[in-house]
C-alpha cells in the first residue's frame, strides 16, 4: 500500500529550506482611501477602501494632472489617520512642507519620513535595508508602513549621472526601464506577506498610435505588469464657480482618472474628479456621474431620481445631488453594492429579487 503524501511535513520542510518563503494567501487587510469615494470604488470595489497595503499602486499622468495631489497628499493623509507610518521619497525635489500641510499631511518626524533622492539604486537600497530590519522584528512589533515615491519618471540611473558628468549625453540605452521593472518586481515580492505597501507616481506621454489613443506610461511596460493597480490621469480645465455655474475663468482642474489595471474591480472604468484651486477636492466629486452611469440615478425631467432599498424615493436637482444635500449620496453608497448586484444577476437567478428590480427601474406615472 502506497504511503499517503504528508502535506504538513512537506510544508515544514520547504519552509525551512527556502528563506523568506510565504505560504498561503496574503489578501489585503488594510486599505487606504484616495480621498475620493468614486475613485475608491473604481479601484477596490468599495467606497471606503482605496489602495491596499502589501501591493504596489501607480498613478500615472501628464504634468499637473493631480498625481501628487492624490499620492503625496490625500493617500498620505488617510494613511496617517489610520496609524500607518509613511516614508515619502521625493525624486522631483518638488514637495514643500507648506504644500503638504495645506493638504492635511502631518509632517512631524513621528508620522512622516521624507527622503530626497534621485537614483533608482538608492531607492532600491533604501527599501531593501528597511525590509531586512522590518523582517527581523517580532510579529507584534511590526508597524504598518507605506512607501510613496513621487515620482518614478524623474529617477536616474548611474549611466545618466556618469554621462552628465562627462558631458556626453548618449542616453541610458534602455537601462532605466529595466531598472524600474526590477525595482517594482523586487518590491512586490518583499511586501507581499507584510503590512507594507507602495504608491508611486509616473509620467505619461501622448500616444502616436491612432488606433490606441490612450496616453503611454514612461519607463516601459515591465513595472506595469508587476503593479496591482494602475490609474492613468489626464488634466482638464475646471471652469465652474463654487455653486457649479459655468464661467470663463479657470478655477481648478478636472482630473480624468481611468483605472487601467486593478485586481479588485472592473478595469478601464473612469471618473472625472473636480479639484478647485481654492477649496480642494470634494470627496463626493464624480459620485453622481458614477451612479448615473450604472443606472441607479435616473433622469426625471430636470431632476435625478433614486429609489433606496427601503423603498424611499429621492428626487433632487443635479446640483443638490452634487452637494450631498440631506445625505443623499451617502444613501446611494449605502445601497449601491446591494442594488448593483441584483441588477447584474442573470435572469434565471433573480426569481426572488424580481420585485426589487422592478422597484429600482420603476418610473412614476404622470
Explain the meaning of each model-derived region.
Residues 108-121, 227:
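A glycine-rich helix N-cap at a beta->alpha junction
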Residues 86, 146, 198:
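Hydrophobic "anchor" residues on beta-strands that sit immediately upstream
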Residues 81, 103-110, 163-173, 215-220:
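A short alpha->loop->secondary-structure connector
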Residues 1-22, 32, 238-366:
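C-terminal regions of RecA-like/P-loop NTPase motor modules
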Residues 173-294:
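Phosphate-binding/switch region of NTP-binding enzymes
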Residues 2-110, 125-132:
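The Walker A/P-loop phosphate-binding site
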Residues 95, 155-156, 207-208:
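Catalytic P-loop NTPase motifs of RecA-like helicase/translocase cores
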Residues 118-195:
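Phosphate-binding/switch loop-helix module in NTP-utilizing enzymes
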Amino acid at each position: 500500500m502506497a504511503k499517503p503524501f504528508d502535506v504538513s511535513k512537506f510544508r515544514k520542510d520547504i519552509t525551512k529550506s527556502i528563506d523568506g518563503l510565504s505560504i498561503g494567501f496574503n489578501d489585503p487587510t488594510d486599505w487606504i482611501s484616495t480621498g475620493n469615494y468614486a475613485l475608491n470604488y473604481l479601484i477596490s470595489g468599495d467606497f471606503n477602501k482605496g489602495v491596499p497595503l502589501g501591493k504596489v499602486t501607480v498613478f500615472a499622468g501628464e504634468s499637473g494632472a493631480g498625481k501628487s495631489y492624490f499620492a503625496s497628499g490625500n493617500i498620505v493623509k488617510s494613511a496617517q489617520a489610520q496609524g500607518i507610518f509613511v516614508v515619502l521619497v521625493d525624486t522631483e525635489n518638488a514637495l514643500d512642507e507648506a504644500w503638504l500641510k495645506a493638504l492635511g499631511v502631518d509632517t512631524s518626524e513621528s508620522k512622516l519620513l521624507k527622503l530626497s533622492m534621485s537614483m533608482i539604486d538608492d531607492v532600491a537600497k533604501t527599501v531593501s535595508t528597511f525590509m531586512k530590519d522590518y523582517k527581523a522584528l517580532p510579529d507584534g512589533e511590526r508597524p504598518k508602513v507605506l512607501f510613496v515615491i513621487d515620482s518614478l519618471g524623474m529617477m536616474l540611473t548611474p549611466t545618466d549621472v556618469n554621462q552628465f558628468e562627462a558631458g556626453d549625453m548618449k542616453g541610458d540605452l534602455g537601462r532605466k526601464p529595466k531598472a524600474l521593472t526590477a525595482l517594482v518586481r523586487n518590491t512586490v515580492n518583499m511586501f507581499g506577506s507584510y503590512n507594507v505597501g507602495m504608491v508611486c507616481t509616473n509620467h505619461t506621454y501622448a500616444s502616436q498610435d491612432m488606433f490606441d489613443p490612450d496616453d503611454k506610461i514612461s519607463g516601459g511596460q515591465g513595472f506595469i505588469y508587476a503593479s496591482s493597480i494602475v490609474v492613468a490621469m489626464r488634466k482638464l480645465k475646471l471652469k465652474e464657480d463654487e455653486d457649479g455655474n459655468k464661467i470663463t475663468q479657470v478655477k481648478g482642474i478636472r482630473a480624468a482618472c481611468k483605472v487601467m489595471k486593478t485586481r479588485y474591480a472592473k478595469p478601464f472604468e473612469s471618473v472625472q474628479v473636480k479639484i478647485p484651486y481654492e477649496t480642494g477636492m470634494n470627496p463626493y466629486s464624480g459620485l453622481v456621474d458614477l451612479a448615473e452611469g450604472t443606472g441607479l440615478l435616473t433622469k426625471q425631467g430636470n431632476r435625478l431620481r433614486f429609489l433606496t432599498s427601503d423603498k424611499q424615493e429621492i428626487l433632487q436637482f443635479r446640483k443638490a445631488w452634487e452637494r450631498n444635500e440631506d445625505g443623499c449620496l451617502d444613501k446611494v453608497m449605502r445601497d449601491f453594492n446591494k442594488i448593483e448586484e441584483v441588477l447584474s444577476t442573470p435572469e434565471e437567478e433573480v426569481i426572488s429579487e424580481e420585485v426589487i428590480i422592478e422597484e429600482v427601474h420603476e418610473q412614476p406615472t404622470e
